[in-house]
């Protein structure tokens, strides 16, 4: 009888705990849903003019395969860039940016130092990489492709970036900003970055294809 009473007590306690958890979890779900809801941002048209990259809120990054099983990501921390935006015809806009090779950062200083050597970028001889746009094509609503010349080391080759961009927003300091997101893939060996060892299973310890990722925030230049 005592065992029976204990079983009933445990069952009641378990039911109460489950009920409380359901109520609590339901509240958390509602709060969480409200917290992650996409903001209803009222963007405005991007005004024409010259824009500079806000380097504190922009990323020129990359990702490359390691041992054909994982990705190593990195970025260039010292860079600058300019966008000359044509509000009448986006395809007539111009983009250029440059990054200091010495500023490469993959989160591991020993690897960073190796990337700066002649095995890879040879920062002492070629201190900067740069991109200069040649044209922009529209590929649908809000979709564009940016074409241009990318120079790394002693090689300049044409590449293209599919990209999207936001409308403009005012910032707290009286400026106007908009964002650009772009991504493309290049072959590092096209730019004489050839270091790497073949793996017995196939492939290389450092992948040949490099994904280049741009997350750019541009602020309108102030009138001089």
Question: Which residues make up each language-model segment?
Answer:
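N-terminal secretory signal peptides that target proteins for export/translocation
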Residues: 1-9
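Bacterial N-terminal signal peptides
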Residues: 11-27
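Low-complexity, acidic/polar, glycine-enriched regions of mature
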Residues: 27-224
């Amino acid at each position: 009888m005592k065992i029976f009473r204990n079983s009933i007590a445990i069952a009641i306690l378990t039911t109460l705990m489950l009920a409380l958890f359901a109520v609590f979890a339901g509240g958390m779900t509602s709060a969480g849903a409200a917290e992650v809801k996409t903001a209803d941002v009222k963007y405005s048209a991007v005004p024409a003019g010259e824009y500079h990259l806000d380097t504190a809120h922009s990323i020129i990054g990359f990702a490359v395969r390691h041992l054909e099983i994982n990705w190593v990501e990195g970025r260039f921390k010292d860079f600058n860039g300019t966008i000359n935006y044509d509000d009448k015809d986006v395809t007539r806009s111009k983009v250029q940016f440059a990054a200091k090779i010495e500023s490469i950062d993959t989160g591991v200083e020993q690897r960073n130092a190796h990337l700066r050597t002649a095995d890879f970028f040879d920062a002492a001889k070629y201190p900067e990489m740069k991109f200069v746009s040649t044209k922009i094509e529209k590929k649908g609503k809000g979709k564009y492709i940016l074409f241009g010349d990318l120079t790394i080391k002693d090689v300049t080759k044409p590449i293209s970036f599919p990209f999207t961009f936001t409308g403009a927003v005012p910032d707290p300091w009286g400026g106007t900003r908009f964002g650009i997101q772009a991504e493309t893939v290049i072959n590092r060996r096209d730019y004489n970055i050839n270091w790497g060892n073949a793996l017995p299973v196939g492939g290389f310890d450092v992948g040949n294809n490099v994904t280049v990722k741009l997350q750019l925030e541009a602020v309108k230049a102030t009138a001089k």
